[in-house]
Amino acid sequence: MASTTPNFDAIVIGAGFSGMYMLKSLRDSLGLNVRVFEAGGTVGGTWYWNRYPGARCDSDSYIYCFTFDKQLLQEWEWSERYPEQPEIMRYLEHVAHRHDLKRDMQFNTRVTGAEFDESTDAWAVHTDRGDLVTARYLIAAVGSLSHTNMPAFKGLETFTGTWYHTSRFPQAGVDFTGKRVGVVGTGATAVQAIPEIAQQAKHLTVFQRTANYCVPARNGKVDPEVVKARKADYDGVVRRIRESFFGQEHYFIPKSVLETTPEERE
């Protein structure tokens, strides 16, 4: 390296929930000079990439949010128990604007490599746009839900129809009206997408290798009185989810399933 003074105190890879929080904490709480590199066109992480029909959160909305802004916890109103992708994106964009996070973010930029130089005690970070920047700290907030798992199907390159991958769905959406559609897989993503596509498609075929266990979502509007009670006890909510094994207000039933009757198990 030509200089022993890093360009930044810290570089964060990714601008999803974790990357946004890291920037907020390092910059505003610790006073560090931070740069975030994000491959997508804006904040959101997995919610930026996964915009397939029916994409929504599977955690209760009142805990699927940042807790560092207590005023925002009181102000923000979620429309459903499990909000859809567009609503989550609106929330993340609002947080980014409210806390001026984007001024320290560089979008449409993918980190391609990083090396630690022991002689200068700094990281050298390379991007696909030709950047070479240095930092004392490097934080990978890349997540685990946005990398495309593209199946190696024979003949995919010569298929004359149109095909899509749920993690790279067109931003403008797709109109399946009158179409014959095939969906490969019945995992968590397909469970959300299939019912939505079925409402439009002329014919839908689902290809399933292994059956997966699903529970009813029981989604819907949240009782205003329940919302009011949660907002009045957000400190308690945060404490309980941090103490919970699941990170949510759900707990183990302290007995074996074999101790229950068949009716209870159902």
Q: Residue locations for each model-derived region?
A:
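Conserved beta-strand scaffold positions in the cores of enzyme catalytic domains, especially
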Residues: 63, 105-106, 161-164
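Beta1-alpha1 glycine-rich phosphate/pyrophosphate-binding loop at the start
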Residues: 8-102, 208-209
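Residue-level detector of flexible, active-site-proximal loop/helix-junction positions
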Residues: 70, 112, 118, 170-171, ...
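Rossmann-like dinucleotide-binding core of oxidoreductases
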Residues: 3-7, 11-17, 22-36, 40-42, ...
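Short low-complexity, flexible loop/linker segments enriched in glycine and/or proline
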Residues: 50-51, 120-121, 220-223
